[in-house]
């Protein structure tokens, strides 16, 4: 496939999107990333509310803890890329296996945060969940770039981030909030806890499933990538 137009310019959006969407691995990884962001933005927006409603902690102290835990997210992004590059030298499927595995490992830790009454233990656990759940981004960007030609890479990043943010920001906080409001008459201030418990586990496993499916097609799709 031609990776630039006849005048030397980069391929247009339509061409890049058509190329990406013809690759089954990208279709599944983009859905996985979108659901991943759905969990991230949904849980992230309501986690402060969970602590303020159900734990004895002041706003300022909570903000400090959560700000510090975001550093772990940066570490997770680096480690996700590092592990994928290291393991991917032997088998490119690791670029999807790393996000899938870290996403599944994340789940029991985040369930502990939602269920425990131990405030500071829950806050310390956010460092673990932050690191694990941010390990997905670098591998998915790397494999997306590998599926396209050099001149398509910027646009392919934009397409992936559009899907990620459309699903994540567009629906994550809205769905968590909607479920919380629906069950509020029954559970009161506990409704945010049960909303997270209803939505997050299913969505997390759903995301990981698409990563595993994408991994099945990675090697074949990389063979078709423009050189």
Residue ranges and their predicted role:
Residues 51-52, 83-84, 88, 175-185:
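Interfacial helix-cap and linker-helix signal at transmembrane-aqueous boundaries
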Residues 120-136:
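Hydrophobic core of transmembrane alpha-helices in multi-pass small-molecule transporters
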Residues 4-30, 54:
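Juxtamembrane intracellular "pre-TM" segments in multi-pass secondary transporters
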Residues 85-102:
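Cytoplasmic membrane-interface "Motif A"-like loop-to-helix N-cap segments
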Residues 77, 147-185:
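A late C-terminal transmembrane helix in Major Facilitator Superfamily
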Residues 107-115, 197-227:
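Multi-pass alpha-helical transporter architecture, strongest
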Residues 23-80, 133-141, 168-176:
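Extracytoplasmic gate region of multi-pass secondary transporters
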């Amino acid at each position: 496939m031609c990776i630039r137009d006849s005048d030397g310019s980069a391929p247009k959006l339509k061409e890049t999107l058509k190329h990406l969407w013809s690759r089954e691995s990208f279709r599944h990884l983009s859905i996985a990333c979108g659901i991943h962001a759905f969990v991230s933005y949904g849980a992230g927006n309501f986690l402060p509310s969970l602590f303020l409603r159900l734990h004895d902690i002041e706003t300022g102290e909570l903000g400090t803890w959560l700000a510090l835990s975001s550093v772990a997210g940066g570490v997770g992004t680096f480690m996700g890329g590092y592990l994928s590059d290291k393991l991917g030298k032997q088998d490119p499927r690791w670029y999807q296996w790393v996000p899938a595995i870290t996403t599944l490992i994340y789940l029991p830790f985040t369930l502990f945060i939602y269920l425990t009454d131990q405030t500071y233990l829950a806050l310390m656990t956010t460092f673990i969940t932050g690191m694990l759940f941010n390990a997905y981004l670098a591998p998915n960007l790397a494999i997306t770039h590998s599926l396209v030609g050099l001149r398509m890479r910027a646009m392919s990043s934009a397409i992936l981030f559009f899907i990620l943010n459309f699903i994540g920001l567009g629906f994550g906080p809205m769905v968590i909030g909607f479920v919380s409001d629906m069950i509020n008459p029954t559970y009161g201030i506990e409704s945010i806890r049960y909303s997270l418990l209803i939505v997050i586990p299913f969505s997390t496993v759903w995301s990981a499933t698409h990563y595993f499916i994408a991994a099945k097609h990675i090697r074949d799709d990389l063979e078709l990538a423009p050189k």
